């Protein structure tokens, strides 16, 4: 179970709704993955070229999954705050995935403006989930202004590279043990999702890895299973890696000459 802002969700997977081949494939993918939330932006066009409107909103409602609006495409504090306020009116929710991009090539979050916007929105009653880097200090500042969960990236959006800064992500997890951390962006394979879940991260948010795959419906299922498997492995307590071999079969009753040195 995933807990965010004192609210509990049955899944640790969050799924984006952009760039699916057709609305029907989007709907089937969501139903297959059964995510905790589905993200959507006021700025994006609907699936298959459908304009963002009542039809797309009806499709989202049919899935029965809570909607997490985002501020994708925003590059200033005022733009992000205004978009979040509009999203609250349209989708009737205080949840917001806060995105503030600082570089057009890498789509890296502008953590300075992110902190400022997060503080404004939290004071306005929003439950803010900020899309951020793995920078520990920036993440602490987001917590200082009232964020109760963070969404650090694994790699730049849409790259599918997996956790390119594994050390920094593991440090972040170690130093913020009680903060829900959801890996957002950069994952391309279910194995990569399982890996970060094995490290102890609380959830994963995906879009491109599913929507642009050869078979989004089956890929959605694959990621859902990977996230669940990774979490189970973390909770089970994996064995530590060793430099030397260690037999799993007991040596009791083994003939003495088997241990002789040659």
Curated annotation (Swiss-Prot):
Pathway: Cofactor biosynthesis; thiamine diphosphate biosynthesis. It comes from the Bacteria. GO terms for molecular function: thiazole synthase activity. It is found in: Cytoplasm. Its EC number is 2.8.1.10. Keywords: Cytoplasm, Schiff base, Thiamine biosynthesis, Transferase. SUPFAM superfamilies: ThiG-like (SSF110399). Its main location: cytoplasm. Transmembrane segments: none annotated. One of its GO terms (biological process) is thiamine diphosphate biosynthetic process. GO terms for cellular component: cytoplasm. The active site is at 97 (schiff-base intermediate with dxp). 1-deoxy-D-xylulose 5-phosphate binds at residues 158, 185-186, 207-208. InterPro entries: Aldolase_TIM (IPR013785), Thiazole_synthase_ThiG (IPR033983), ThiG (IPR008867). Signal peptide: none annotated. Residues 243-262 are annotated as: Disordered. It catalyses: [ThiS sulfur-carrier protein]-C-terminal-Gly-aminoethanethioate + 2-iminoacetate + 1-deoxy-D-xylulose 5-phosphate = [ThiS sulfur-carrier protein]-C-terminal Gly-Gly + 2-[(2R,5Z)-2-carboxy-4-methylthiazol-5(2H)-ylidene]ethyl phosphate + 2 H2O + H(+). Homotetramer. Forms heterodimers with either ThiH or ThiS. HAMAP family: ThiG. Catalyzes the rearrangement of 1-deoxy-D-xylulose 5-phosphate (DXP) to produce the thiazole phosphate moiety of thiamine. Sulfur is provided by the thiocarboxylate moiety of the carrier protein ThiS. In vitro, sulfur can be provided by H(2)S. Belongs to the ThiG family. This is Thiazole synthase. It comes from Neisseria meningitidis serogroup C (strain 053442). The gene is thiG.
């Amino acid at each position: 179970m995933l807990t965010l802002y004192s609210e509990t969700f049955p899944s640790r997977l969050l799924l984006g709704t952009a760039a699916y081949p057709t609305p029907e494939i989007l709907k089937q993918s969501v139903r297959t993955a059964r995510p905790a939330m589905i993200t959507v932006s006021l700025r994006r066009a609907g699936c298959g070229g459908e304009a963002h409107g009542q039809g797309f909103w009806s499709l989202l409602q049919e899935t029965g999954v809570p909607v997490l609006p985002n501020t994708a495409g925003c590059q200033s504090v005022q733009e992000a705050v205004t978009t979040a306020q509009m999203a609250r009116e349209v989708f009737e929710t205080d949840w917001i995935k806060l995105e503030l991009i600082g570089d057009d090539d890498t789509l890296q979050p502008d953590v300075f403006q992110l902190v400022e916007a997060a503080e404004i929105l939290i004071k306005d009653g929003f439950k803010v989930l900020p899309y951020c880097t793995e920078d520990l200090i920036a993440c602490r500042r987001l917590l200082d202004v009232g964020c109760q969960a963070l969404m650090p990236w694994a790699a730049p959006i849409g790259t599918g590279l997996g956790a390119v800064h594994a050390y920094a992500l593991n440090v972040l997890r170690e130093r913020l043990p009680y903060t829900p951390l959801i890996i957002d962006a950069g994952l391309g394979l279910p194995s990569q999702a399982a890996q970060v879940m094995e490290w102890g991260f609380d959830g994963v948010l995906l879009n491109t890895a599913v929507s642009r795959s050869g078979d989004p419906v089956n890929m959605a299922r694959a990621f859902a299973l990977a996230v669940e498997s990774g979490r189970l492995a973390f909770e089970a307590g994996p064995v530590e890696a060793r430099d030397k071999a260690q037999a799993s079969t007991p040596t009791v009753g083994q003939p003495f000459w088997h241990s002789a040195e040659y």
